[in-house]
């Protein structure tokens, strides 16, 4: 039996290892566009590789049907992943927040050990091979790569991901191949990505970073709230809180909804207490400019913009600020509104949303419901996880199940 795996990422790698361990007589070829496999693994977690998470459920995923992941997460939960990692010599560092990293704290350890496992099992790896199309003739799949017909195969796994990180040769060739076999897909979009905002003053806030709570409002209705770092940039906002909230925000943008963020700079302080603090500051320094006094509370980049939004002259002294204006300042700091107009795109995204419709794929085997012996795994499917190791774990879990089912003759 000959098997082709299109994409040497997490799901493709673990599928190959699993299948070969179960049947050493099969021949497996992995095709990857890069000079070496696992490039996205190397880039994950800022080079540290947030490889998994100890607490995982369908609640950590978005897509056409998030519960599609339930069977895979049950069959290949964190304990199963931990056991698998030990078989290739990969030791893990489990953090208190549930995030999991290689004990070496380097993503390179992950790719090295998986590569050694593939080599030991005699899996063929064809790097810098750009798969352009797949055809089915009789019961065989024909792979075309680098402008020529390559080989024929009994089974094919599409684990090529989507367009996130095009600098790593990420493309949507998997969707093109799926479409050629009659599959449909939901539109793709960047996920876990910085957000561009409409406000004209945004460049003046570049570099400001603070822990905040961020509320997401879609068409004026509250959707979600996230606590975490917010980084103001020349284009808008980034930081962990923004990456987390971007998933639902970007999905709403693709549906042409109005998307607004409301940033609370002091999430642990009530609006009344904040107003009292500001009033006390102004009372203690009545002859100083309000804008200068506010820098004891908030960044000196934010203070002048804050007064401008509250329609208070920047040269106004503290004792000239009335109670109504103080409440206005406190309210603005409690609910700073930003209109989201776009994202930073796939080149800055950690993941992609959208993809092959999961309703067309068996959730237990990950085989196509339309084409026998055609399989899908990982990001190419319309499943995207939250930040924190969830996307990589779905890649491992889906690839593992594919590996088990690639060896069966049905």
What is each PLM-predicted segment?
Residues 4, 20-46:
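Glycine-rich FAD pyrophosphate-binding loop
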Residues 163-177, 181, 383-409:
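A conserved FAD-binding loop/helix module that cradles the flavin
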Residues 155-201:
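Glycine-rich loop(s) and the adjacent beta-strand/alpha-helix scaffold that form part
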Residues 4-6, 31, 131, 150-167, ...:
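Short hydrophobic core segments
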Residues 126-127, 133, 304-384:
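A glycine-rich dinucleotide-binding beta-alpha-beta segment and adjacent secondary-structure elements
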Residues 46-97:
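Glycine-rich active-site loop/strand segments that organize a redox cofactor
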Residues 35-37, 43, 51-58, 184-187, ...:
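An anion/pyrophosphate-binding glycine-rich loop and adjacent beta-alpha core
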Residues 75-155, 303, 307:
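Feature captures the FAD/FMN-dependent oxidoreductase FAD-binding
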């Amino acid at each position: 039996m000959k098997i082709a795996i299109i994409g040497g990422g997490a799901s493709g790698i673990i599928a190959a290892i699993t299948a070969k361990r179960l049947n050493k007589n099969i021949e497996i070829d992995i095709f990857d566009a890069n000079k070496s496999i696992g490039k996205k693994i190397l880039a994950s977690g800022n080079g540290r590789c947030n490889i998994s998470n100890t607490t995982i459920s369908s609640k950590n995923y978005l897509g056409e049907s998030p519960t599609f992941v339930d069977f895979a997460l049950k069959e290949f939960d964190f304990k199963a992943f931990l056991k698998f990692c030990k078989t290739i010599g990969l030791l893990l560092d489990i953090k208190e927040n549930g995030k999991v990293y290689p004990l070496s704290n380097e993503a390179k350890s992950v790719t090295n050990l998986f590569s050694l496992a593939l080599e030991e099992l005699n899996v063929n790896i064809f790097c810098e091979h750009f798969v352009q199309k797949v055809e089915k003739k009789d019961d065989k799949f024909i792979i075309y790569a680098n402008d020529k017909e390559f080989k024929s195969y009994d089974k094919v796994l599409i684990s090529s991901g989507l367009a996130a990180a095009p600098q790593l040769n990420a493309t949507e060739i998997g969707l093109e191949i799926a479409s050629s076999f009659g599959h449909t897909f939901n539109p793709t979009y960047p996920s876990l990505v910085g957000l561009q905002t409409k406000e004209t003053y945004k460049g003046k806030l570049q570099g400001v970073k603070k822990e905040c709570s961020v509320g997401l409002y879609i068409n004026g209705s509250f959707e979600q709230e996230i606590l975490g770092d917010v980084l103001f940039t020349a284009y808008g906002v980034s930081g962990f809180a923004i990456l987390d909230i971007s998933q639902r925000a970007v999905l709403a943008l693709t549906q042409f909804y109005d998307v607004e963020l409301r940033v609370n700079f002091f999430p642990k302080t009530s609006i009344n207490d904040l107003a009292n603090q500001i009033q006390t500051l102004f009372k203690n320094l009545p002859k100083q400019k309000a804008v200068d006094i506010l820098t004891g509370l908030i960044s000196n980049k934010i203070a002048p913009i804050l007064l401008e939004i509250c329609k208070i002259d920047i040269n106004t002294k503290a004792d000239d600020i009335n109670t109504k204006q103080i409440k206005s300042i406190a309210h603005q700091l409690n609910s700073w509104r930003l209109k989201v107009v776009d994202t930073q795109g796939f080149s800055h995204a950690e993941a992609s949303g959208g993809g092959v419709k999961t309703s067309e794929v068996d959730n237990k085997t990950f085989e196509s419901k339309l084409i026998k012996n055609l399989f899908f795994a990982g990001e190419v499917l319309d499943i995207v996880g939250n930040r924190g190791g969830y996307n990589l774990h779905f890649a491992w879990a889906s690839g593992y199940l594919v590996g088990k089912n690639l060896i069966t003759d049905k």
